[in-house]
Amino acid sequence: MVLSIDERASLSLMLLQNVLRSINNTKTYVEPRVVGGDSWVQSMANQESAKWEPDFGGGPNKVVKDAVLSAYEIDIEGIIVLPGDLGFLNPHDIDQMIDLSKNLTRAVIARATADGGTNAILMPNGMLIDPSFGPGSFERHLHLANIANIPMSICNAKGLEFDLDRPEDLLAYRQSRSDFDEVLNWWTDKLKSI
């Protein structure tokens, strides 16, 4: 399946909306923030009651580190880094991460099954693990936490295992959602109407 540029943008918004709605429906209050993206991403963040912040560049790992440090500076108790392409994420997955943190006394990480990357990481204030996202980052993050003596739990929630990085991921996601084409077309039409 090959998506047009408009369809790729639409898919990104579909997935981001799922992530933000999952955050907004957790049993524990989590303040959603979105870092970076275009005006559509900013609009989606606003629509889903998330705070939007600009991306000041330097690559994804620097952007994540800057966002985490910024949150720590304003005494946020902890931060969960979630990519916007978690199509199967649900509120229970996020609640499970929070529970595994044992009242924010340990960091929590979730593996991307397909490439060994990191699909989520919860870092309580004072437990910064230097971001090293990308293929194989799950093991890197575990190693960095170990070096820094940060206690770490692993979350195996199903909705955190799958992200859309490869064509076969898109096919699997499409097959799992009976409304995929309808929702994608709705978003594509909406983007074209502006």
Question: Where are the language model's segments positioned?
Answer:
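A short, N-terminal amphipathic alpha-helix
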Residues: 10-29
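Short phosphate-binding loop-to-helix
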Residues: 46-78
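Short beta-strand-to-loop acidic/aromatic patch adjacent to the donor-nucleotide binding site
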Residues: 77-85
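Glycine-rich N-terminal loop/short-helix segment of MobA-like nucleotidyltransferase
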Residues: 1-10
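Short, glycine-/small-residue-rich phosphate/pyrophosphate-handling segment
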Residues: 124-145
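Conserved donor-nucleotide/metal-binding helix-loop-beta segment in metal-dependent transferases, i.e.
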Residues: 89-115
